[in-house]
């Protein structure tokens, strides 16, 4: 799929969000104006019920968006209680977690899924699966488009029996926390897959890795984690929790935070978009917009570039000044990747609300993939941004769709696509980029910063060496 980047912006809006108060009533609905208007800033208007005024009359004050439910959930046991809680957990039935289970424990415990306080019980699961949202006690709704559940097999269910609490055991064998007041219910895999992905075709990466081999039961309950989840992979310092990110935004006195998620290396088209977004936010009247560059750090499919390589590449982008370190925060989003298109992109946006971002950049075919059995995209590439503009529970988040960027063969750089010069632009797909790196061929000058590109070349060289050694062993 081509790396097509779209961006449009809000023009002439008034925002007044005093610190420590609730944000303005702001809807994420979008309407596209006539394409004959050449100003990209006017191609998108956010409808809301505040009076529209000129930018020159705008009043902007620094304030972060409220987390879903009004309070950020943190489920780490206080240090003074850890000894007692650990002793209690030793007497509980044990539930063994796999790596993706652990990633979900990480997500829930830090509050990315606020107001969710544990793996879903059946009522929460059904609301998420059928309505993409959860109803709170006060009657309001928050977005929750992906079921966050823990599967167990028949033997584990039998061992739990009538116990109200269970201990959670990480893949390395240590007890890391517990689920309390548990509820066990049937895991209807086919229904879950069909409703989440819109297909039950074989070849869905998350399904084959996680759901198909999982147990026939789901267990929900209130989560307690003894210590923050660490992976000891040299990247934990990048894994800032929503609370830590909010504190960092405050420390930098950010009055707007725009989040950009990716699971690929950053090329200059991405950088063009992010830098242009900041420029437009400044034109809107914001004084200190901060970019949250937020690569996904959980499960990804086998042919995606590994997290450690991506993080090294991202660091080179900042070192080379392609992105400004003073106005950019690079952090890892710990969620596993579903590749569930418009359903999943709602989760990605919702989690950034809890982290304090009030603008979210969405691109072509977000969270999408090629159809696993047919030669076509699994989802309509434009549906992701359209769904975000209408999704219940995301009204307070401002959605910024991408503007198309491609390689300008005349200017020798990544630039916003000009339809009147269509033949002078080159779209470099992710597949093409990987082919360049694997074969040692350099992409066109200006596509990616050289030091960042070298990171990818070295990775693919090491991958080829490893594959050659494995082949030699097989052939021996």
From Swiss-Prot:
Q: In which pathway does it act?
A: Sulfur metabolism; hydrogen sulfide biosynthesis; sulfite from sulfate: step 1/3
Q: Which reaction does it catalyse?
A: sulfate + ATP + H(+) = adenosine 5'-phosphosulfate + diphosphate
Say which species the protein is native to: Arabidopsis thaliana (Mouse-ear cress)
Starting at the broadest rank, the lineage of the source organism is: Eukaryota, Viridiplantae, Streptophyta, Embryophyta, Tracheophyta
In which domain of life is the source organism classified? Answer: Eukaryota
GO cellular component terms attached to this protein's record: chloroplast; chloroplast stroma; nucleus
Briefly describe its induction.
Answer: In roots, upon sulfur starvation.
Name listed for the protein in its UniProt record: ATP sulfurylase 2
Please provide the record's keywords in A-Z order: ATP-binding, Chloroplast, Cytoplasm, Nucleotide-binding, Nucleotidyltransferase, Plastid, Transferase, Transit peptide
């Amino acid at each position: 799929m081509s790396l097509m980047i779209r961006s449009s912006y809000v023009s002439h809006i008034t925002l007044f969000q005093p610190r420590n108060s609730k944000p303005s009533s702001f809807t994420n609905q979008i309407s596209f104006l006539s394409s004959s208007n050449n100003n990209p800033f006017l191609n998108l208007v956010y409808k809301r019920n505040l009076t529209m005024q000129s930018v020159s009359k705008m009043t902007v004050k620094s304030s972060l968006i409220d987390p879903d439910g009004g309070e950020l959930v943190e489920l780490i046991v206080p240090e003074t209680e850890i000894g007692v809680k650990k002793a209690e957990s030793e007497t509980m039935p044990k539930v063994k977690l796999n790596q993706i289970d652990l990633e979900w424990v990480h997500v829930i415990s830090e509050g990315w899924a606020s107001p969710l306080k544990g793996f879903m019980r059946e009522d929460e699961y059904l609301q998420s699966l059928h309505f993409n949202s959860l109803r709170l006690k006060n009657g309001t709704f928050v977005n929750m488009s992906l079921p966050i559940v823990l599967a167990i097999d028949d033997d584990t269910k039998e061992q739990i029996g009538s116990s109200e609490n269970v201990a959670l055991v990480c893949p390395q064998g240590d007890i890391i926390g517990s689920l309390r007041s548990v509820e066990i219910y049937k895991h209807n895999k086919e229904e879950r897959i069909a409703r989440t992905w819109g297909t039950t075709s074989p070849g869905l990466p998350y399904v084959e890795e996680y759901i198909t081999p999982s147990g026939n039961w789901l267990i929900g309950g209130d989560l307690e984690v003894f210590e923050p989840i660490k992976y000891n992979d040299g990247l934990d310092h990048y894994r800032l929790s929503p609370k830590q990110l909010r504190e960092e935004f405050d420390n930098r006195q950010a009055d707007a935070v725009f989040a950009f998620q990716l699971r690929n290396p950053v090329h200059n088209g991405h950088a063009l978009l992010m830098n242009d977004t900041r420029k437009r936010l400044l034109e809107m009247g914001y004084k200190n917009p901060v970019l949250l560059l937020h690569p996904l750090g959980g499960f990804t499919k086998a042919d995606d570039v590994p997290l450690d390589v991506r993080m090294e590449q991202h660091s080179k982008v900042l070192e080379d000044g392609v992105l400004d370190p003073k106005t950019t925060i690079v952090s890892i989003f710990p969620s596993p990747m579903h590749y569930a298109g418009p359903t999943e992109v709602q989760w990605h946006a919702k989690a950034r609300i809890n982290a304090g971002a009030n603008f979210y950049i969405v691109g072509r075919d977000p969270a999408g993939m090629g159809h696993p059995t047919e030669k076509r995209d699994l989802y309509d590439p434009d549906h992701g941004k359209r769904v975000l503009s209408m999704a219940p529970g995301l009204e307070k988040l401002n959605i910024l769709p991408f503007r198309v960027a491609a390689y300008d063969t005349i200017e020798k750089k990544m630039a916003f696509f000009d339809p009147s010069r269509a033949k002078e632009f080159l779209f470099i797909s992710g597949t093409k980029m990987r082919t360049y790196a694997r074969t040692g061929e350099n992409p066109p000058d200006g596509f990616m910063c050289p030091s960042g590109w070298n990171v990818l070349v070295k990775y693919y060289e090491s991958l080829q060496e490893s594959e050659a050694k494995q082949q030699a062993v097989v052939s021996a």
